[in-house]
Amino acid sequence: MSNDEFPTDQPAVVTCGLPYANGDLHVGHLRTYVDGDALSRALRRIGQQTAFVSGSDMHGTPVAVNAAEEGVAPREFALDFHETYAETFPQFNIEFDNYGHTDDETNVELTQEFVRSWVENDHVHEKEIEVAWDTEEDQPLPDRYVEGTCPYCGEQARGDECDEGCQRHLEPGEIEAPVSTLTGNPAEYRTREHKFLRLADFQEYLQGFLDRLEGTDNAQNQPREWIEGELQDLCITRDMDWGVDYPEDVDGGDELVLYVWVDAPIEYVASTKQYTERVGDDEYDWEAVWKIDSEERHGTEWDDEWADDSGEIIHVIGRDIIQHHAVFWPAMLRGAGYNEPRSILATGFVGIDGNALSTSRNRAVWADEYLDAGFHPDLFRYYIATGAQIDTDVDFSWDRFQERVNGELVGNVGNFIYRSLLFAERNYDGTPDAAVSDDVRGRIEDAIADFEAAVREYDIRELAEIAIELSNYGNEYIQRNEPWNLVDDDPEEAEQVIRDCVQLTKAVAVLMQPVLPGKAERLWGQLGEQGSVADVTLDSALEAPPAEFGEPAELFEQVEDDHIEALNEELQERVEEASEASAEASNEGGEAAGDEVDDGDVDTADLQPLVEDRISFEDFEGVDMRVGEIRSAEPVEGADKLLRLEVDIGHEVRQVVAGLRQLHDAEKLPGTRVILLANMEKAELFGIESNGMVLAAGDEADLLTTHEDAPLGTRIK
């Protein structure tokens, strides 16, 4: 859904999902921030007052777990990564107006203010719940301290989310067959008292919010299934030492910290507030964005007239956190009397060489690796912004990177700009003394209109391609008119052609700035323009360039074969080393237990402990597993990881919903032999009945099959 009103009279804020401060950045992380940065630049280009903010997520179990493994305090551990992120983002020309973190004073105070507001408006209650407990360590196991089985889809899940399957948020006590990540032992459930936000108070509001929401379709459609039934209350506290303390002046919160997904999104508000405190509210007023007519309007309803008195809140996130931003977060804001998001853009994932990005297997391209390779950051920005629509996955490969840079940037944009400016400088000392032709002016005006439309559609890919298409037009124009032949035969026409080409070059600089800001700035300087291209509006694309400028330099450099070959070899070696290390670690564990070890070249997994409870032969006889064959496979609308399969099991063709979308090419699945658990209870996922379960092994969803061609419907014994 688009916003036809941009630019508006109210300020806008573009935010990006907070990176967990517990690991190095890779290209998968960077996609969200490149898209957010490009959108914020484009909004400014059309005259929309815009702030671009984010921050590091310092709290939660991932940070606490990794800090404990390193033997340092969680804050020290997280601050180290926060400082690294703050240094890395600008190296990719990702320029936040403010980049804070969730443990800073501003965010802690705002978070506690939000909670007090919820309590005062009776949106919080206390109840006893079952929480996972490690009996060996004698401590509770919040969130990622526990893993097990998702009660909704049966996939492997973390304590607070089904990250491998249906992507649902999981409340404490929901996960089945819980296992402690501290000791690897089965966990037990014990009763504890915790605080809950009454999401049911906001059910009607949330349904209307999704109707109003702009952005990507997945952000609007995916949450509908979650709010159709009775909304479960959100547990907002955890049994941990690390996090924002539950407010001391509110009864019953002793020794509890707030759930990380309470304080994390509030950092968007805190970071915007910090920006205002730095530049002054005359330049940018955070309350004009986050509050309604700069005030708090409490209640569980929304008045459509408030939209005219409120700023534009735009969230750019990974699609794995849609539920948090499209269900929990708007309820949190409404409960505190704040404004609601205007739009949510949920980006697709980034794969590597046709495979899922896997940090455990070192199948990743790291941010510092890209920079160390010596490539300009804008080349990556262009690749990732134009690789697919924002809500679709992008595959990154060094070979494709080379192909696109050399073909699209060097061969198209760079070629047109260099020969146009070089010809102009050598023959006219700069811009020829002529007016721009009507045809070229019209073409630039069309490009400007397309740019404005792309911003209103939140179409980052189109934003990037407009400048490329204009450059392609310029290449065709100069090639068709051959000014090098006109200089002697028709000097006036030669002047006209080069005048047009210089104007097209300036327009390309203006239009490519959101995605290629560094290269646009360099081109701006080559044109002899004053100031920064970042500060001009779209109209400047039609303003005359300076009469004089110096000899240009090549804007883009060719990516050489030997460089790419070396990077491919390095990546392959890392993947192989990680696989070998994983195999050795598993083998060592097996030998210590006295098990025989297979010395073959086989990938091994981090093994979960065996289930201690035994089943009888009669119980096993009750499990009906059949040989099947996938007849068709198609994505489930609104679900990022699910496919709807039709599986032939001899007796009949079954419809099955399976979490295979990110791990298998749907087009290649038909004809694949699988094992189907045929007497699995029927389930409904995203409104589709699933009649059985396809069996698969491990995080990569390795599909189980038979060694020989057993007839369809053959029972597994």
Curated annotation (Swiss-Prot):
Q: Give the top-level enzyme category.
A: ligase
Region labeled Disordered — which residues?
Answer: 573-603
What residues does the tRNA-binding domain cover?
A: 619-717
Q: Which cofactor does it need?
A: Zn(2+)
What reactions does this protein catalyze? tRNA(Met) + L-methionine + ATP = L-methionyl-tRNA(Met) + AMP + diphosphate
- Which PROSITE patterns does its entry note? AA_TRNA_LIGASE_I (PS00178), TRBD (PS50886)
User: 'HIGH' region: where is this motif?
Assistant: 19-29
**Superkingdom of the organism of origin:** Archaea
Listed binding positions for Zn(2+) are 150, 153, 162, 166
Cofactor binding note from Swiss-Prot or TrEMBL: Binds 1 zinc ion per subunit.
Compositionally biased, Acidic residues: which spans? 593-603
Q: Name one GO cellular component term.
A: cytosol
GO molecular function annotation = ATP binding; metal ion binding; methionine-tRNA ligase activity; tRNA binding
Low complexity: bias regions: 580-590
Task: Give the UniProt subcellular location, in the record's own words.
Answer: Cytoplasm
Q: What positions does the record give for the motif labelled 'KMSKS' region?
A: 356-360
Name its GO BP terms in alphabetical order. methionyl-tRNA aminoacylation
Main role? Is required not only for elongation of protein synthesis but also for the initiation of all mRNA translation through initiator tRNA(fMet) aminoacylation.
HAMAP family linked to this entry:
Met_tRNA_synth_type1
Query: PANTHER family in the record, alphabetically?
Result: METHIONINE--TRNA LIGASE (PTHR45765), METHIONINE--TRNA LIGASE, CYTOPLASMIC (PTHR45765:SF1)
Assembly with partners or alone: Homodimer.
Q: Which family does it belong to?
A: Belongs to the class-I aminoacyl-tRNA synthetase family. MetG type 1 subfamily.
Protein's name in the database: Methionine--tRNA ligase
Q: Which organism is it from?
A: Haloarcula marismortui (strain ATCC 43049 / DSM 3752 / JCM 8966 / VKM B-1809)
